């Protein structure tokens, strides 16, 4: 088994090789505007998982997934030529969900900003229920304590 650092270096190298091969060698018309976002290699260097995003709608994403699946052999051969590992890892392509997650997070942040604005609007004319400083301070407690609460010796 290889160490994790070697697997990480190999994953970075595979990511670059596949991205360049998609740009230069694969001429499939189904292939949309693809960005390889991440690559991970198992510690035994046998399997590589490549994460990608596609700019476009669901149909373009599905077409790109089919194009990547059909070009897997060419891409694996290209990876095999350009790495120094004894065996060429198998390639698995996974659509990256980062754009969808980012849109969902953006929606949550927008909702939080709207609620903050509502709270600020409600607080505009509000008054304190127990005065501005509703908390006891140590000086207030000293004044409230009488001789009966003095420590016994």
UniProtKB/Swiss-Prot annotation:
GO terms for molecular function: ribosomal small subunit binding. Residues 116-153 are annotated as: Disordered. Transmembrane segments: none annotated. It is found in: Cytoplasm. InterPro entries: KH_dom-like_a/b, RbfA, RbfA_dom_sf. Its main location: cytoplasm. GO terms for biological process: maturation of SSU-rRNA. GO terms for cellular component: cytosol. The keyword Cytoplasm applies. Keywords: Cytoplasm, Ribosome biogenesis. Residues 119-132 have a biased composition (Low complexity). Pfam families: RBFA (PF02033). Monomer. Binds 30S ribosomal subunits, but not 50S ribosomal subunits or 70S ribosomes. NCBIfam families: rbfA (TIGR00082). One of several proteins that assist in the late maturation steps of the functional core of the 30S ribosomal subunit. Associates with free 30S ribosomal subunits (but not with 30S subunits that are part of 70S ribosomes or polysomes). Required for efficient processing of 16S rRNA. May interact with the 5'-terminal helix region of 16S rRNA. Belongs to the RbfA family. This is Ribosome-binding factor A. It comes from Kocuria rhizophila (strain ATCC 9341 / DSM 348 / NBRC 103217 / DC2201). The gene is rbfA.
């Amino acid at each position: 088994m290889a160490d994790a650092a070697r697997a990480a270096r190999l994953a970075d190298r595979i990511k670059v090789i596949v991205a360049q091969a998609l740009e230069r060698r694969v001429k499939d018309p189904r292939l949309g505007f693809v960005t390889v976002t991440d690559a991970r290699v198992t510690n035994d260097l046998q399997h590589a998982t490549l994460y990608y995003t596609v700019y476009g709608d669901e149909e373009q994403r599905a077409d790109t997934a089919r194009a990547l699946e059909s070009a897997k052999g060419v891409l694996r051969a290209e990876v095999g030529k350009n790495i120094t590992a004894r065996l060429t890892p198998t390639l698995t392509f996974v659509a990256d969900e980062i754009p969808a997650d980012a849109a969902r997070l953006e929606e949550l942040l927008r909702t939080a900003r709207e609620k903050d604005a509502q709270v600020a609007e409600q607080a505009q004319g509000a008054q304190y229920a127990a005065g501005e400083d509703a908390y006891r301070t140590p000086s207030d407690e000293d004044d409230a304590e009488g001789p009966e609460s003095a420590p016994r010796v």
